[in-house]
Amino acid sequence: MSFTVAIVGRPNVGKSTLFNRLVGKKLALVDDTPGVTRDRRPGEAKLVDLRFHIVDTAGLEEAGADTLEGRMRAQTEIAIDEADLSLFVVDAKMGLTHVDKALADMLRKRGKPVVLVANKSEARGSDGGFYDAFTLGLGEPVPISAEHGQGMIDLRDAIVEAIGVDRAFPEDDDDVAETDIVLRPTVEGEDDEEDLAYDDTKPLRVAIVGRPNAGKSTLINRFLGEDRLLTGPEAGITRDSISVEWDWRGRTIKMFDTAGMRRKARVIEKLEKLSVADTLRAIRFAETVVIVFDATIPFEKQDIQIVDLVLREGRAAVLAFNKWDLVEDPQAVLAELREKTERLLPQARGIRAVPMAGQTGYGLEKLMQSIIDTDMVWNKRISTAKLNRWLDSVQTQHPPPAVSGRRLKLKYMTQVKARPPAFMISCTRPDSVPESYIRYLTNGLRADFNMPGVPIRIHLKASENPFENKRKRR
């Protein structure tokens, strides 16, 4: 990307709506409630022929440094300092406030390029607010409607003028290089069923989920080594899913911080419902999901439901018992947590559970290695030959039950997909195979092929009867 743009302004002027318009997706939560956005949200923007990196920010307010609003303001000021250009958004419908004027003074003092944007200019009575914006001393405002997409060409022209043509349209040698495509030849006789090598160079998507105030944002900040995400004693600070990238041992990790998930009965406000829906999208987009527990009050009903949700979505799961520095008797608590994990999460037998402390950094290396190891299992493929030898063995040890006096027969097994591992078994009368025997097969696969902590799916298919066609011809 050629340059970075920060969208700034006071709360509820339409910054997130403009962000969504420029990235072409509804990435940021939008609501009439002021102050929905709290963390910096990055994205890749497309505006006519411009391509640039964009950052949505929290609404700027006058507040003390030790308050939540003050910490939000500090995050926004970091975004302004790191950006090449700021889009200063004002509400043309409502007009200017003393906060707008204070923000204009702050932007002028920083000495960086600013484009003044008069949003909601399609509204009746917005002319007064548009002309008032001239008094801010930041040049001619660009009238737009972020909601309806009006004024986008004028905004593009203003950005090019502010940043400069050379910066806006740099020559990119990568555009030529990307056209060179090398096709890998197919080797005759190659066995595509054998276990495939794990690609440890591919970027890994990890979602961090859990109850409110479990320490999710603190954990990510510790990984990054900076206060990138808002944290504090207040529950529910994070409202929408924020993605951040960092490097771990040469591998790109894309982490998604998410809003805390409360019990459904307690989720009343529309905004919180939007936040939970955003968290569900992050889970579905991720490959591995870390469920953060508060080790001082672990295994509440909501914790179990979150783990169950992650597994039902087919994601790889790792448990992180956070705030371990506050646990008084670590050895006894660890033994208790392991026992509860096995008893309360039978569907995730062998799931990796790591004691850690986001505040101090304790256990982070082990947690990250557990994430990588679990992702390897989630991507695991097993050859058909190995599976059928295994199927014969487990049936010898524990044959399928007889139903109505007739023994069930499992004839053939193959892996149909990975991510998560899914298997198809050809058998007689698949509808008659009891759930208990499917659990036996699932647990056997997990133990014999070393697949802890990931969902395993088994599909039963009726085997073809070679005499069926002969009966029909008669």
UniProtKB/Swiss-Prot annotation:
GO terms for molecular function: GTP binding. GTP 1 binds at residues 9-16, 56-60, 119-122. InterPro entries: G_ENGA (IPR031166), GTP-bd (IPR006073), GTPase_Der (IPR016484), KH_dom-like (IPR032859), KH_dom-like_a/b (IPR015946), P-loop_NTPase (IPR027417), Small_GTP-bd (IPR005225). The keyword Ion transport does not apply. GO terms for biological process: ribosome biogenesis. The keyword Iron-sulfur does not apply. Keywords: GTP-binding, Nucleotide-binding, Repeat, Ribosome biogenesis. Residues 3-167, 204-379 form the EngA-type G domain. SUPFAM superfamilies: P-loop containing nucleoside triphosphate hydrolases (SSF52540). Residues 380-464 form the KH-like domain. Belongs to the TRAFAC class TrmE-Era-EngA-EngB-Septin-like GTPase superfamily. EngA (Der) GTPase family. GTPase that plays an essential role in the late steps of ribosome biogenesis. Associates with the 50S ribosomal subunit. This is GTPase Der. It comes from Allorhizobium ampelinum (strain ATCC BAA-846 / DSM 112012 / S4). The gene is der.
